[in-house]
Design a protein with these regions (language model features):
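FAD-site-proximal beta/loop scaffold in flavoenzymes
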Residues: 72-87, 171-244
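Structural/interface elements that position substrates and couple domains in central-metabolism enzymes
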Residues: 10-11, 48, 85-87, 98, ...
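A Rossmann-like FAD-binding core segment of flavoenzymes
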Residues: 24-27, 31-40, 109-209
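Glycine-rich Rossmann-fold phosphate-binding loop(s) that bind the pyrophosphate
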Residues: 93-96, 126, 223
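Glycine-rich dinucleotide-binding loop and its adjacent helix/turn
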Residues: 57-115, 141, 193-195, 199-214
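Glycine-rich active-site loop/strand segments that organize a redox cofactor
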Residues: 1-2
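Conserved redox-cofactor binding core of oxidoreductases
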Residues: 17-56
Length: 244
């Protein structure tokens, strides 16, 4: 309840900032028609078209869970703060910063946490010394960090528990299995292909050094372009685009 209240408070602040800046907010689903037109469909199904000289796409990304047996038994990072009960035993699959954050948070709250990562070391893409230090500190604080460890499948356990079957034949039992195995650009239904906006193989929007897409007049930034998916990075990109 406190989390929901805080989110509502922050949303109210952002709404006020936009109103004071003269921003008109349209509630609905947006679809790109061309380089200067967006169609917005509201909850009642009414569609209106709006034109602008420049269009910015900043729809973010959503958690990606690989297509493994038992994927319906796992949760994503978006679900972790809406769990019906605190997990006494948590298995985190994925060694990126989101997985490491979640593992550390729930260990700090008292959960027994195991983090599984199929690579050689957690936090791929970060400085090697930082990666080793983070792994050592997590282990020091009680997180069971296992590298070169892959999951074969997830099966139901007794009650609401889950069995994590590892590729080497080992098993783990958990109350919650969190998959933090990356995020994918949130582009479904935006009409990018029809409008002529180029996308990478993973669905993210292709942009140049000035955040321009392949469609003149349309820009994109933040997680939807598939670069460093961090809030400070998105804010810096937005400021750079505004200055440009």
């Amino acid at each position: 309840a406190n989390r929901a209240q805080e989110i509502a408070r922050l949303n109210g602040i952002y709404d006020g900032l936009m109103r004071n800046a003269g921003v008109l907010r349209l509630q609905g689903h947006g679809r790109l028609i061309d380089g200067q037109t967006v169609e917005v469909t509201d909850a009642a199904g009414r569609a209106t078209r709006h034109r602008a000289r420049h269009i910015l796409i900043a729809t973010g990304a959503t958690p990606h869970v690989p297509d493994i047996e038992g994927r319906e038994l796992v949760v994503s990072s978006d679900d972790m703060f809406d769990l019906p009960a605190f997990p006494q035993r948590l298995v985190v699959v994925g060694g990126g910063y989101i997985g490491c954050e979640m593992a550390s948070i729930f260990r700090g709250l008292g959960a027994q946490v195991t983090l599984l990562y199929r690579g050689e070391q957690i936090l791929r893409g970060f400085d090697d010394e930082v990666r080793q230090f983070a792994a050592d500190e997590m282990r020091k604080h009680g997180v069971d960090v296992r590298v070169r460890c892959d999951v074969a499948r997830i099966t139901p356990g007794a009650g609401d528990t889950r069995h994590v079957v590892l590729a080497d034949g080992g098993t783990l039992e958990a109350d919650v299995v969190l998959y933090a195995t990356g995020r994918r650009a949130h582009v479904d239904g935006l009409g990018l292909r029809e409008a002529g906006v180029a996308q990478a193989a993973d669905g993210s929007i292709v942009v140049d050094e000035r955040f321009a897409t392949s469609l003149p007049g349309v820009y994109a930034l933040g997680d939807v372009v598939g670069r460093l998916e961090l809030t400070p990075v998105a804010l810096a990109e937005a400021m750079a685009l505004v200055d440009h």
